[in-house]
Amino acid sequence: MARHRTTNVRYALAAGLIVLGSGAVQASLTAPAIAASGSGERQLVSRGTSTIAGSTTVTRHGGLFTGAQVEGDVAGGGKGVNRSFSTRGGRHTAGTTGVTVDGTTPGLGSSFAGLDITDNAKTAGFVLEPPDQGLCVGNGSVLELVNVVGQVYGTGGAKKGPTFYLNDFFNEDPNFANASDPSCYYDADTNRFYADMLFYDSDPKTGDLNGQNRIDVAVSDSGDPMGGWHVYSFDVTKDGPSAFNIGDYPQIGADSQGVYITTNSYPFFENGFGGAQLYALSKRGIANRSDTRVTHVPLSSAQGGKPFGLRPTTSPAAGYARENGGTEHLLSSQAGEETGNHQGFDQGLGLWALSGTDSLAPGASRALTLKRDSVTVDRYGVPPLSEQKAGDYPLGQCLSDLACRTKVFKSTKVSPHVEGQLDSSDSRMNQTVYAKGLVYGTLDTVVNVGGQDRAGLAYYVIRPTTTAGGVLQGTVVAQGKLALAGNNLTFGAFGVTPTGKAVLALNVVGSSYYPSAGYVTFDAAFHPGAVHIAGAGVGPTDGFTEYTDFTGGYRPRWGDYAATAYDPATGSIWMANEYIAQSCSLTQYTADPTCGTRSRYGNWSTRVSQVTP
């Protein structure tokens, strides 16, 4: 999420500064010169060593932070992170048979409350939405990352150390480096943890965004995340059509020899979309510091249009694709407006294969080849926003109540608000996995269940093959949609064991459910079972991005993604989702706007759970 220095009830936006109860004040945007990077090979920059235990835990300043003002409510987006051009809602689709919530929790083991909005306030000194979920598990440690803090737990949920600020962890300036989109991965091959995050800079003199941004990558020195780490970065400012581009929404994948990071490139100071970007690093090379090259793989030759939301796969227990000199598989969807599709629907997925990845071994001459196949699937489309069960939403109610607003916000400007909705994503591909020769993926889609359009999930299991002539082909082994009558299923993330047992982590929210963390298991024929609740929501989400007093436009934030991780020690799947773990009334909020369980400006939490399928 975007961040600037700020005080009082102000909060920073990448597009400018908003003050509670007033209109937007456009910040000047500085665009200094910077050397071109472009496609090809470059060197990672070392940011030095780091430890989780050594991160400071102090309050630097107070404030609210989100991404861009409305972060892409209209085509052309905004000057911020987590952009999305696709308009939510207004689409209709054929009927889908709904699943049920059966009240059981098969295979559920450890399940505990993870990081929440108050951890940002206590550790970083500000609050933001949404969390953006990172999760990786190995050697009895569970590492959770969100915007913009992290925590290491034991498998029973006990904290192994302090909550840490990710700017400290990545050796970034705490005041002028803005952070977004963390993710992480534990690699059993190297017995290392890998983490990545986007950072983009503000000018130290003015606080204005200056257009410079980079991806930071951290690698643990051992299989213990509480030990030492080494931090690298590579600049992505020039990776796109503009003089200044932002490497939005970085996601991590890995195979036998490589670590892969994908981004969506947008012009930093203008409207437009520059396409997905793919970067390849030597997995062992950055772990032992023997090979710090990063290869920017061009995508234009593999697809005529602009690929969007490209998701690299990870593989449980080193079950990598070994053919064609090592292969990393990726998936992308085609319904988003960034691809040039203005209908909001599509019947194709992009299956990608980056071969020759054995050449990412330390010191080897790199010879990577990228191929793509368009795989025909059932029609899917951009989902509508998700409504939630009626309940107390004291922040929104306070903005509408003179007595509360005067006491809490020192303002007499009352504005009416109703209970907000949740973002349901934009049909971009969610977390992907390669296991037992198959690629698993899921995306958010509009579904019609019980005669009503709702947000649901489409899931895919695809077998990639390469013909004797070297042509990549994807065959759909299984596909389907998950829908829940009167409710919504959103932000799915596949977790798969080496034997192909699959769990789909997801959110459950709607007329019957406060925002909850759930999951679905699949049988051997890839048929989904009922929805199970791992962490039941106890109240509505009630965050500042739901209310135009703070944002100047309406894009309620949720997600922006969930995460799963395979635990090689137990054979289980870990999952982390956003949910709402607290509730309080307007009366309680007026007396104490934290209610002892939330922030004045929001109430999101995360749930971390273990499932053995």
What are these regions (language model features)?
Residues 29, 34-613:
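C-terminal PAP-associated
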Residues 2-35:
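Secretory targeting and sorting signals
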